[in-house]
Amino acid sequence: MRLTKRDYEVLSLLNRCRYATTKQLVELYFRENKPKTATRRANLLTKKLLNLGLIHHLERRVGGVRAGSGSYIWFITHKGIKELRKIDPSIKLRLKNRYEPTRNHLKHQLFVTQIFVELKILDADEKMLLENFSFEPKCWRSFATLFSHFTLKPDAFARLTIGNFEDAYFFEADNATEHLGRVVAKCKQYIAYYNTGIEQRENCIFPMIVWIVPDEKRKMALETRIREDLDAYWELFSVITLDEFSNFIQGGQDD
């Protein structure tokens, strides 16, 4: 069976983001259709790729079994990656994962995928131009200090243009599962990287570091710790909820 351009787009997405729900595929590729039609078209596409052995879904579902086929969580198979390599030999093969991801890991990965979805929707609606979006590990940054070598591991990186302005972001998807002390420690890694000047020399600007959190309670707690523990460096960071994300990206949120 011949693959379409959209088939390859879905395979490429799953190779980059690791996991995506049917709903997220609908939002990315079928927004021009009415909801029922969009879901049906997404189901047909995933069924085709599933039957070809190029993708598969986890046993668990978003919303449980009663949510139907629209609740599946999809991932690319080894065969799917090999298919992608036919058009892009630079893509690396990965070892098969024998086990399903933990609940927290999966929730985190889908959160990062949703950040990408939100940006693509803004791009499609011509609210901004998404120049680049990198998932892990492509968004990682390696650097050295006087004492050691480090790898900064953002959850994602994005570069976008709004009007005549170019913005860049490191994103951290926070599900309120990490102790605040570990979050602050991650912030200090960003500060260490900022102080190397590497990003500024290569790209002229240092990306805004955005922590995206599930609710206002977590937002207030994280903002307070950042201001208390990071001295003047707190200005490198913003903390928002996912509901605030679209408005924030468009410049509608105060610092």
Predicted regions and their residues:
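Active-site metal-binding core of divalent-cation-utilizing nuclease and nuclease-like domains
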Residues: 118, 128-169, 178-185
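Nuclease-adjacent, charged terminal/linker segments that flank catalytic cores
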Residues: 1-100
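Flexible, glycine- and charge-enriched loops at secondary-structure boundaries
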Residues: 4, 35, 39, 105, ...
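Amphipathic alpha-helical dimerization/coiled-coil segments
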Residues: 82-132
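C-terminal regulatory/effector modules of DNA-binding transcriptional regulators
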Residues: 156-255
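Hydrophobic, Leu/Ile/Phe/Ala-enriched alpha-helical segments that form helix-helix packing faces
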Residues: 29, 46-50, 115-123, 190-198, ...
